[in-house]
Curated annotation (Swiss-Prot):
CDD domains in the record: TrmD-like (cd18080)
Matching PANTHER family: TRNA (GUANINE-N(1)-)-METHYLTRANSFERASE (PTHR46417:SF1)
Catalytic activity: guanosine(37) in tRNA + S-adenosyl-L-methionine = N(1)-methylguanosine(37) in tRNA + S-adenosyl-L-homocysteine + H(+)
Protein's organism: Vibrio cholerae serotype O1 (strain ATCC 39315 / El Tor Inaba N16961)
NCBIfam families, per the entry: PRK00026.1, trmD
Family: Belongs to the RNA methyltransferase TrmD family.
Protein's name according to its UniProt entry: tRNA (guanine-N(1)-)-methyltransferase
Annotated S-adenosyl-L-methionine binding sites: 113, 133-138
Length: 247
C-alpha cells in the first residue's frame, strides 16, 4: 500500500514509518509513506501557509495555493488510482467496517488540516471522502491520519505475522475481544481460566466466543443491536448472562 501525506508537520509520521508494526511493514516494502509539506509550495519568503477567513471570526485557515499545490504533487506521485481523504471532525466516523473498506485501496492520500480548517472549495474539488476518528476536535489531522494508517495497515497481507490476529481483534466480527492471558499461571492469587489450559480447541473457541459476546453485552450493548447472532451465539450469550446474574 502507498500512502501520501499532506501535512505541515511531516516529521510526526516518523512514529508510523520508523516504529512498531507499521515500521516493520515499511522496511519490508509492504507499506510506503511519502509526505508533502505545503510550506514547500509557498511563494513568499516567509513560506506562509495560513490566511484570513472571509466573514471574519477567530483563527485562520490553511492558505489555498500552497495546500492545493501540495495535494496536486501528491496525486502526481501516486503509483496508481488514488483515494484522497481529508481528516475532519465533519467526516464519517472511522470504525472497523470503515477500516476494512479503506484497506481495499492500494493508494491513499491523507490531507491533514491545521488552524480552523481548509477552504470548502478545496474539499469539493480535491477530496473524495472525509473521515473522523471521533466526535472531538484536535489541533490537526496528523494524529487521526496516523490512526488511520495504523489500523488500515493491519489488513495488508504480510504485515501481521498471523493474519488471524486482525480477524480476531475487537470489532473485527462486530464484537469486543475476549480476555487474554499469559504467564504466570497464577498472578496475585488469580488463576488463568482452566479451559485455556485444557488443550481442547473447541472448548477454548466456545469460551472465547462466550466471553466476547458477554463483554460486548456488558460494555457496548448497542453493538449487539446491529448483529444477527447465530443460534450458537444466542445460546452462549444467554449462558453468560445467567452466569453473570448468579455471581
Amino acid at each position: 500500500m502507498w500512502v501520501g501525506i499532506v501535512s505541515l508537520f511531516p516529521e510526526m509520521f516518523r512514529s508510523v514509518t520508523d516504529f512498531g508494526v507499521t515500521g516493520q511493514a515499511v522496511k519490508k516494502g509492504l507499506l510506503s509513506v511519502e509526505a508533502w509539506n505545503p510550506r514547500d509550495f509557498a511563494h513568499d519568503k516567509r513560506r506562509t501557509v495560513d490566511d484570513k477567513p472571509y466573514g471574519g471570526g477567530p483563527g485562520m485557515l490553511m492558505m489555498v495555493q500552497p495546500l492545493r499545490d501540495a495535494i496536486h504533487a501528491a496525486k502526481q506521485a501516486s503509483p496508481g488510482k488514488t483515494k484522497v481523504i481529508y481528516l475532519s471532525p465533519q467526516g464519517r466516523k472511522l470504525d472497523q467496517q470503515g477500516v476494512e473498506e479503506l484497506a481495499q485501496n492500494q493508494n491513499l492520500i491523507l490531507i491533514c488540516g491545521r488552524y480552523e480548517g481548509v477552504d470548502e472549495r478545496i474539499i469539493e474539488s480535491e477530496v473524495d471522502e472525509e473521515w473522523s476518528i471521533g466526535d472531538f476536535v484536535m489541533t490537526g489531522g496528523e494524529l487521526p491520519a496516523m490512526t488511520l494508517i495504523d489500523s488500515v495497515s493491519r489488513f495488508i497481507p504480510g504485515v501481521l505475522g498471523d493474519f488471524a490476529s486482525a480477524e480476531e481483534d475487537s470489532f473485527a466480527n462486530g464484537l469486543l475481544d475476549c480476555p487474554h492471558y499469559t504467564r504466570p499461571e497464577v498472578l496475585d492469587g488469580k488463576e488463568v481460566p482452566a479451559v485455556l489450559k485444557s488443550g481442547n480447541h473447541e472448548d477454548i473457541r466456545r469460551w472465547r466466543l462466550k466471553q466476547s459476546l458477554g463483554r460486548t453485552w456488558l460494555r457496548r450493548p448497542e453493538l449487539l443491536e446491529n448483529l444477527a447472532l447465530t443460534d450458537e451465539q444466542e445460546q452462549l450469550l444467554t449462558e453468560y448472562i445467567k452466569e453473570t446474574r448468579h455471581q
